[in-house]
Amino acid sequence: SMDFQQMPIGFAMALAQNAAAMEAYAALSREAQSDILTRAHGARSEAEMHRIVSGIVNS
């Protein structure tokens, strides 16, 4: 299960808008999820956050 509490709000919102990314994220290992969350915490803009989320599907 996904812990939305640990997610930056912008990341959670972007993920919620992208069903494919949410499914792909849920299927990742904890380590891979953690790497993505680290990048999401460092995102400086909404556009960067969306790039991180869309990158989940394309990885």
Regions found by a protein language model. Name each.
Residues S1-S59:
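Charged, low-complexity intrinsically disordered segments
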